[in-house]
Swiss-Prot record:
Region Head domain (RuvB-H): start-end pairs: 277-361
Record-annotated disulphide pairs: none
Name of the molecule in the record: Holliday junction branch migration complex subunit RuvB
Small ATPAse domain (RuvB-S), as annotated region: 204-274
Role of this protein: The RuvA-RuvB-RuvC complex processes Holliday junction (HJ) DNA during genetic recombination and DNA repair, while the RuvA-RuvB complex plays an important role in the rescue of blocked DNA replication forks via replication fork reversal (RFR). RuvA specifically binds to HJ cruciform DNA, conferring on it an open structure. The RuvB hexamer acts as an ATP-dependent pump, pulling dsDNA into and through the RuvAB complex. RuvB forms 2 homohexamers on either side of HJ DNA bound by 1 or 2 RuvA tetramers; 4 subunits per hexamer contact DNA at a time.
Residues that hold ATP according to the record: 42-43, 84, 87-89, 150-152, 193, 203, 240
């Protein structure tokens, strides 16, 4: 280890190095069906079942099968991309494909090195450790993770004061799967320790339609193909949103009809839930309205927009803006946010001369 110093920490209270690690209950991706378990029941269980992301699936299959053929644990895996594209599902599939147990945590939960040590000490050989939002891991825990990822060991300090002793703790070989929505916030030393990195991309309407059709079969929902396309086209390129909209349309169809979903039922349901033909919801339209009607199309700072719509700046910046920028409705400039011609047109207004061009996808 050349780029970081050796990390030492105090042994967490209750950790006994003399006792073998006890296996926790495995994470099971298939649980009983119930309204609160629907999201889990819709998760694919293998790379073959996973819809979309063909390049990632091909590359990951090579990594996993190569490791299995050699009888070793695969390299650590970093999955990056916007929320809702299947990073957690992919981690579950990796464990399933390897026949291993999956241990799950998140970056914000690892505030101290001892938090990570407690989890690492319970790993069994071949386990998959999934850290969601890994870019938010605390620095002391991150530095310990360097040694664990490279050398499968960490150093612990037993005792206090002058009598404290540093003891190396060997960790069984494991595979770390990290997920992040902000790959740029990862430090170089952490990023470099992942042997395989993959960027999850937004879905097109065709793949989202397949996602919806698969979910409808699992949920035993009677839906026309055209209705599935209609829902998919409003799902913002995100499978999680597609599945959520399907469930809301199902509710509408069951309450107001016989449960069958055709295009008319899908359109009516999505109107009730304030999702327009391009997938924009109430907050998205409020942001566009504040930008165009309140400030003549901009440029406007994000703080001003947030005040206008009654939300936190982080909500506008992280929830609304990514899709509005992708949809060609907002342009981010050095002076602030500017509405494009497509945004004016979407609100039924005539774009002023000189408005930035933008096309809906």
């Amino acid at each position: 280890m050349s780029d970081v110093e050796r990390t030492e920490f105090k042994l967490p209270e209750g950790m006994d190095l003399s006792s073998p690690p006890q296996r926790n209950q495995d994470v099971d991706a298939a649980e009983q069906q119930g309204e609160h378990d629907i999201e889990r029941s819709l998760r694919p269980k293998s790379l073959d079942e996973f819809i979309g992301q063909p390049k990632v699936r091909e590359q990951l299959s090579l990594v996993l099968n190569g490791a299995k053929n050699r009888g070793v644990t695969p390299d650590h895996v970093l999955l990056s991309g916007p929320p809702g594209l299947g990073k957690t599902t992919m981690a579950m599939i990796i464990a399933q494909e390897l026949g291993s147990s999956l241990r799950m945590t998140s970056g914000p939960a690892l505030e101290r090195a001892g938090d990570l040590a407690a989890m690492l000490s319970n790993l069994m050989e071949g386990d998959v450790l999934f850290i969601d939002e890994i870019h938010r891991i605390a620095r002391p825990a991150e530095e310990m993770l360097y040694m664990a990822m490279e050398d499968f060991r960490i150093d612990v300090i037993v005792g206090k004061g002058p009598g404290a002793t540093s003891i190396p703790l060997e960790i069984p070989p494991f595979t770390l799967v990290g997920a992040t929505t902000r790959a740029g916030m990862l430090t170089g030393p952490l990023r470099d320790r992942f042997g395989f990195t993959a960027q999850m991309e937004y879905y097109d309407t065709e793949d989202l339609t397949r996602v919806i059709s698969r979910a409808a079969r699992i949920l035993e929902v009677d839906i026309d193909q055209d209705a599935a396309v209609e829902i998919g086209s409003r799902s913002r390129g995100t499978p999680r949103i597609a599945n959520r909209l399907l469930r809301r349309v199902r509710d509408y169809a069951e309450v107001n009809g016989d449960g069958h979903i055709d295009v008319a039922a899908a359109q009516a349901a999505l109107r009730v839930f304030d999702v327009d033909e391009r997938g924009l919801d109430r907050l998205d339209r409020a942001v566009l309205g504040a930008l165009i009607k309140g400030h003549g199309g901009g440029p406007v700072g994000v703080n001003t927009l947030a005040i206008a719509v009654g939300e936190e700046p982080s909500t506008v910046e992280e929830v609304c803006e990514p899709y509005l920028v992708r949809a060609g409705m907002i342009s981010r400039t050095g002076r602030g946010r500017v509405a494009t011609a497509a945004a004016w047109q979407h609100l039924g207004l005539e774009a002023p001369e000189g408005a930035i061009g933008g096309t809906l996808f």
